[in-house]
């Protein structure tokens, strides 16, 4: 199958691992390599692309800054090292992107931020606003509070969740290997790179190997798990070597990599999930003008809501009905039931005075809204 071109994607998540970013001997960032990557990101940014970075390295940097001895760290030691390293990592990304006139915004997430709908919406809104302001979000797992029981444990899967959350259409995993091979390349000189994977099958998963072979496959098992998450959500993914300077430029120029393709797109996949997988917790009845606006692709504003029924929290799914009570669609609501009832019928600027907080302008954002009745 024909491999896509980087220039055809509008929102790209780039995952950078510790081994690429940090010199293991010196315990410091590989400055020249990072400068080259930042130049690649700036090039994409200049041409109107949204770029998000998922960056490892906080624990490794913290160890270096604290001059900790080599060897395994206890959980609380890792968390304390991450606290120091996160400050250093944020400053480094801010400086290298700032050299190109690009602002960077640090976002630290935990597993719950992508699993709980309320927190998911908060994180998604923050990312969306940074991108609207043409900043580059730099995202990492919050290692200072994550525990063994509630954490991603690897940034491949975190990057896939971030891509899903941000409705990215491409996820790039920069690795120490240039893609998926049909056999371990270190042990088999005849191993062949697989340029395109149209579907993650059992055969593809077998090529990635089990946990015991991760070192010889470049941690490929978690990358395949990331591919499953991303492609299910409508996001294409690719694995490419980050060991070279200007790795994104190399991809754009047709360099070696493995593409994982999906027939869906992020918005349709997300809306399919809203329509088919979530049990509605309440109902919003809207006026005729709001019905017309929604059918024209607009978001649902508080002013168009005439009745609120049910007990729902922010982030829950609700049914949207017209004045004749026919179902218009379903969506994820930005307010809980009590607040939605208080602001219904009011213009968005009134929300601050009614609730005492600066709330969302929309009751349901159009990206969180699926039009049409869902069969029972």
UniProtKB/Swiss-Prot annotation:
User: What is a single molecular function from GO for this protein?
Assistant: RNA binding
Q: What main location does UniProt list?
A: cytoplasm
Q: What does the entry list under GO cellular component?
A: cytosol
Q: Where in the cell is it found?
A: Cytoplasm
Which branch of life, at top level? Bacteria
Instruction: Detail which positions bind substrate.
Output: 56, 143, 155
**Amino-acid biosynthesis recorded as keyword:** yes
Question: What InterPro entries does UniProt report for this protein, alphabetically?
Answer: AceGlu_kinase-like_sf, Asp/Glu/Uridylate_kinase, G5K_ProB, Glu/AcGlu_kinase, Glu_5kinase, Glu_5kinase/COase_Synthase, Glutamate_5-kinase_CS, PUA
Give the EC number(s) listed in the UniProt record. 2.7.2.11
Its UniProt pathway annotation is:
Amino-acid biosynthesis; L-proline biosynthesis; L-glutamate 5-semialdehyde from L-glutamate: step 1/2
UniProt cross-references to Pfam families, sorted A to Z: AA_kinase, PUA
Name the positions where ATP binds: 15, 175-176
Q: Does the keyword Lyase apply?
A: no
In this protein, which residues make up the domain named PUA? 281-358
Q: What are the alphabetically sorted keywords of the record?
A: Amino-acid biosynthesis, ATP-binding, Cytoplasm, Kinase, Nucleotide-binding, Proline biosynthesis, Transferase
The cross-references to HAMAP family, in alphabetical order and at most eight, read: ProB (MF_00456)
Role this protein plays? Catalyzes the transfer of a phosphate group to glutamate to form L-glutamate 5-phosphate.
Protein family according to the UniProt entry: Belongs to the glutamate 5-kinase family.
- Protein name stated in the entry: Glutamate 5-kinase
Organism, by scientific name, is Rhodopseudomonas palustris (strain BisB18)
């Amino acid at each position: 199958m024909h491999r896509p071109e980087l220039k055809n994607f509008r929102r790209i998540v780039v995952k950078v691992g510790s081994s690429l970013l940090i010199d293991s001997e010196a315990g410091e960032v590989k400055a020249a390599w990072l400068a080259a990557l930042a130049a690649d990101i700036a090039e994409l940014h200049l041409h109107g692309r949204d770029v998000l970075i998922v960056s490892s390295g906080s624990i490794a940097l913290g160890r270096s800054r604290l001059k900790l001895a080599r060897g395994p760290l206890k959980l609380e030691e890792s968390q304390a090292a991450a606290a120091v390293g996160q400050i250093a990592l944020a400053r480094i990304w801010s400086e290298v992107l700032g050299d190109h006139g690009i602002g960077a915004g640090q976002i630290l997430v935990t597993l719950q931020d992508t699993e709980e709908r309320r927190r998911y919406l908060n994180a998604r809104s923050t990312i969306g606003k940074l991108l609207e302001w043409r900043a580059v979000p730099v995202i990492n797992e919050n290692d200072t509070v994550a525990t063994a029981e509630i954490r991603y444990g690897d940034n491949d899967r975190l990057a896939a969740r971030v891509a899903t959350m941000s409705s990215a259409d491409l996820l790039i995993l920069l690795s120490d290997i240039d893609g998926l091979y049909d056999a371990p390349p270190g042990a088999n000189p005849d191993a062949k790179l697989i340029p395109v994977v149209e579907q993650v099958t059992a055969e593809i998963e077998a090529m990635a190997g089990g946990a015991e072979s991760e070192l010889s496959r470049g941690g490929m098992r978690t990358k395949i798990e990331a591919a499953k998450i991303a492609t299910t959500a409508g996001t294409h993914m690719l694995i490419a070597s980050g060991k070279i300077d200007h790795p994104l430029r190399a991809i754009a120029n047709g360099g070696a990599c493995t593409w994982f393709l999906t027939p869906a797109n992020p918005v349709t996949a997300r809306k399919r999930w809203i329509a088919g997988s979530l049990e509605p917790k309440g109902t919003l009845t809207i006026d005729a003008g709001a019905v017309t606006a929604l059918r024209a692709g607009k978001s649902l504003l508080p002013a168009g809501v005439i009745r609120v029924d049910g007990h729902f929290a922010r982030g829950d799914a609700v049914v949207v009905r017209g004045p004749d009570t026919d179902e218009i669609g379903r969506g994820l609501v930005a307010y809980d039931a009590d607040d939605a009832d208080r602001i219904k019928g009011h213009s968005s600027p009134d929300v601050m005075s009614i609730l005492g907080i600066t709330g969302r302008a929309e009751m349901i954002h159009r990206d969180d809204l699926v039009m049409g009745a869902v069969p029972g």
